[in-house]
């Protein structure tokens, strides 16, 4: 592109400096800075739904910048015309596959339904929504010189972009707060502690509030975005512009600053405060001796989740840093339009792609850091390729079928197996009838009517224990007692996508 600009500048200089006879005149008109003008024109023509670069509220600046005699680099001669669509195709495929699988895992696997995973589900929904509604439209910004989708999709694209950014950054802030309470003050029910109903209700309320707040922040883009026609070299360039002129000349600057504060600076400061407090607490806890081994393991697990959330925050900060740097420079630097050069042009394109790449980065990061998500992702991925052949042979598809981890069903299967062994005269398996104490009201000691024998399962006993109806090495535990113990400690059977 730089070579094309130099060639154009040379041709224009030759046309200005020579007359029809080929001799140089005695006095030449002043030579304009053609290179800077061409960069400015490339900036204006490639305005997009996500990247309005010119404050068109000032008609004087626009008339000085866009002239009918100055050439510009056509889209077909720009490298970003071919590079950006390829990158957006990769973002679309990875984002749909990763976020879609993440949503399916959460909805299909009951053990995944806890507080941290609920926030991760909210992130995946926002990312999948912006990938489906905005990425296909935004991929053509560097391909064609006009917005071909109409005014409605212009407003919808801008709105969904702001909603997705808002849900992402607000959810990361909520996750950081949840990790703070889980590590520093684990007795409070503001985090995923045992999957309690109160924690679940509060998590759902927080997630819904985040979506409502993000929708509220995106309403200005939905209402104000419209199509704008620009005339360049007798061409009509149509762009999707989110800052209407009738809303004031400083409206664009105000929105750029507001987006930086609400969508980036303030949430990252809050997250940083949470993690500084977590680090101080962990440093203090490490100096206190005599902790129980189980508590140490629990703290380590929560610390791992906190590190994973911090990785999501770092990815978000890196992806949107060029975005805010470019916009703050362009709208608040006094000579930004005059200083726009190759460096800022490349930075603008990189920031444009990185802002959308954030929507597919979370599932990729989660796949590498979370063994639970990696296991379920591989299971569903293999299911699509192998289920057909296995079903035709009548075989059980171990990749597709979800194994029920409930201890109740496991205990029932163990009893059926031992009862079958008893029928086959295997001595190590027995069926015991327990004595039921009947009360005068016709019930047992728990107040429940029992008309059949209570089934019991063999469990290992301590050495030297004597049991009348069982081998010395075995005892029997009632099935209903096992179920009661399972319900009293459900946290052991829950998984987290962040583990």
Curated annotation (Swiss-Prot):
Subcellular location: Cell membrane
Disruption outcome: RNAi-mediated knockdown results in enhanced sensory responsiveness, or arousability, while awake, characterized by increased locomotion in response to vibrations. During sleep results in hyper-arousability with fragmented sleep patterns characterized by slight decrease in duration and increase in frequency of sleep bouts. Targeted RNAi-mediated knockdown in PAM dopaminergic neurons leads to increased arousability during sleep but not while awake.
An example Gene Ontology CC term for this record: plasma membrane
Main location: membrane
Cytoplasmic face of the membrane: 107-117, 184-203, 281-309, 370-499
InterPro entries listed in its UniProt record: Bombsn_rcpt-like, GPCR_Rhodpsn, GPCR_Rhodpsn_7TM
Summary of the function given for this chain in its UniProt record: Receptor for the neuropeptide CCHamide-1. Plays a role in the modulation of starvation-induced olfactory behavior where starved flies show increased responsiveness to food odorants, repellants and pheromones. Contributes to regulation of sleep latency (the time required to fall asleep), amount of sleep and depth of sleep (arousability). Involved in modulation of PDP1 and PDF levels in s-LNv (small ventral lateral neurons) clock neurons in response to CCHa1 released by DN1a (anterior dorsal neurons 1) clock neurons, to regulate morning activity.
Name of the protein this chain belongs to: Neuropeptide CCHamide-1 receptor
């Amino acid at each position: 592109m730089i070579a094309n600009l130099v060639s154009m500048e040379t041709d224009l200089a030759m046309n200005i400096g020579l007359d029809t006879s080929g001799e140089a005149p005695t006095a030449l008109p002043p030579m304009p800075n053609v290179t800077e003008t061409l960069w400015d024109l490339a900036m204006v023509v490639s305005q997009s739904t996500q990247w309005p670069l010119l404050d068109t509220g000032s008609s004087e600046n626009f008339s000085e910048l866009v002239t009918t005699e100055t050439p510009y680099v056509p889209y077909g001669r720009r490298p970003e015309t071919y590079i950006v669509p390829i990158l957006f195709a990769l973002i679309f495929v990875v984002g749909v596959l990763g976020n879609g699988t993440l949503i399916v895992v959460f909805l299909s696997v009951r053990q995944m339904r806890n507080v941290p995973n609920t926030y991760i589900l909210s992130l995946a929904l926002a990312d999948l929504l912006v990938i489906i509604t905005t990425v296909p439209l935004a991929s053509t910004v560097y391909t064609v010189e006009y917005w071909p989708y109409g005014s409605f999709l212009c407003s919808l694209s801008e709105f969904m972009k702001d909603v997705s950014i808002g849900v992402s950054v607000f959810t990361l802030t909520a996750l950081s707060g949840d990790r703070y309470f889980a590590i520093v003050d684990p007795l409070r029910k503001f985090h995923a502690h045992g999957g309690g109903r109160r924690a679940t209700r509060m998590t759902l309320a927080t997630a819904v509030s985040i979506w409502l707040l993000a929708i509220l922040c995106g309403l200005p883009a939905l209402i104000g975005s419209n199509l704008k026609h620009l005339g360049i070299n007798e061409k009509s360039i149509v762009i999707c512009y989110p800052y209407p002129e009738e809303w004031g000349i400083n409206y664009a600057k105000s929105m750029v600053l507001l987006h930086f504060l609400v969508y980036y600076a303030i949430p990252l400061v809050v997250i940083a405060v949470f993690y500084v407090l977590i680090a101080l607490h962990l440093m203090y806890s490490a100096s206190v001796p005599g902790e129980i081994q189980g508590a140490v393991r629990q703290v380590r697990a929560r610390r791992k989740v906190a590190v994973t959330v911090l990785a999501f925050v770092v990815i978000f900060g890196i992806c949107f840093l060029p975005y805010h740097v470019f916009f703050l420079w362009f709208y608040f630097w006094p000579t930004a339009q005059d200083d726009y050069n190759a460096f800022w042009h490349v930075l603008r394109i990189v920031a444009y792609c990185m802002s959308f790449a954030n929507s597919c980065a979370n599932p990729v990061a989660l796949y590498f850091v979370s063994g639970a998500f990696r296991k379920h992702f591989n299971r569903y991925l293999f299911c699509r390729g192998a289920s057909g052949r296995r079903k035709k042979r009548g075989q059980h598809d171990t990749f597709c079928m979800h194994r029920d981890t409930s201890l109740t069903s496991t205990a029932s299967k163990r009893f059926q197996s031992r009862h079958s062994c008893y029928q086959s005269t295997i001595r190590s398996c027995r069926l015991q009838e327990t004595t039921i104490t009947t009360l005068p009201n016709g019930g047992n000691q728990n107040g429940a009517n029992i008309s059949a024998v209570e089934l019991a399962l063999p469990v290992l006993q301590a050495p030297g224990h004597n049991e009348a109806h069982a081998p010395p090495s075995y005892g029997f535990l009632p099935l209903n007692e096992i179920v009661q113990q399972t319900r009293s400690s459900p946290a052991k059977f829950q998984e987290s996508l962040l583990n």
